[in-house]
């Protein structure tokens, strides 16, 4: 949208500057929203913070210039000693099957088993193996500590009669593009805290709050100029 530089003789108005201030305030608010999500995600198991990315064409495409990258650095591992709690010590994701048949990636490894021996998330989504199939234990043990999950993700259940482990496949660990992650990165009895540092998020948010205040002040000045120009036109 274009604005005239001069509404009437002797009265100048920068319409482009007004539009820029509006876009800048919207951008600041959207970026602060990303930092807000990170702050909310601080206490979420396996949450990965987001970094705001601003396009070099922000001046021309407004709020559409904002996107984000996911920070895939590994968070701190916390011991729980729960045999069904798993964490990944390297970059990668567990695969879970949603009720609609789609596959979702997560680093939240708080799992459980149902009566059928299926390994599930806390939301009852099925955990997938390295072959892409749901992991099902050959039988449900009386004690959870009879379930063994190795560093390589191999799942086994101790059979007292056979005096050995009965295999139930491997935990599927994949990269963001879905390719298998090789390595010994599965930690049984641990969960991963988020990789959010609150001090960093609050500091970044404070910077954009200052930017928002500056852009709002500029908007007020330009808006007052517009009001003055319109009033002057009424007297012509």
Protein language model features and the residues they cover:
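Amphipathic alpha-helical polymerization modules
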Residues: 1-236
């Amino acid at each position: 949208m274009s604005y005239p530089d001069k509404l009437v003789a002797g009265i100048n108005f920068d319409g482009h500057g007004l539009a820029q201030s509006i876009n800048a305030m919207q951008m600041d608010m959207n970026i602060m929203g990303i930092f807000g999500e990170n702050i909310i995600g601080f206490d979420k198991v396996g949450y990965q913070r987001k970094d705001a990315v601003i396009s070099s064409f922000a001046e021309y495409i407004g709020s559409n210039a904002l996107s984000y990258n996911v920070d895939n650095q590994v968070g701190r591992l916390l011991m729980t000693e729960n045999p069904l709690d798993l964490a990944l010590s390297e970059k990668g994701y567990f695969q879970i099957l949603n009720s609609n048949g789609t596959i979702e990636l997560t680093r939240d490894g708080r799992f459980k088993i149902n009566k059928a021996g299926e390994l599930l998330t806390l939301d009852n989504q099925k955990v997938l193996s390295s072959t892409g199939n749901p992991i099902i234990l050959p039988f449900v043990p009386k004690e959870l500590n009879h379930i063994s999950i190795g560093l390589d993700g191999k799942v086994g259940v101790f059979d007292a009669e056979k005096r050995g482990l009965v295999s139930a496949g491997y935990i599927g660990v994949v990269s963001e593009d879905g390719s298998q992650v090789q390595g010994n990165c599965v930690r049984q009895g641990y969960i991963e805290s988020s990789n959010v540092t609150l001090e960093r998020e609050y500091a970044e948010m404070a910077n954009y709050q200052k930017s928002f205040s500056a852009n709002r002040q500029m908007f007020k000045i330009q808006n007052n100029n517009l009001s003055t120009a319109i009033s002057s036109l009424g007297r012509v």
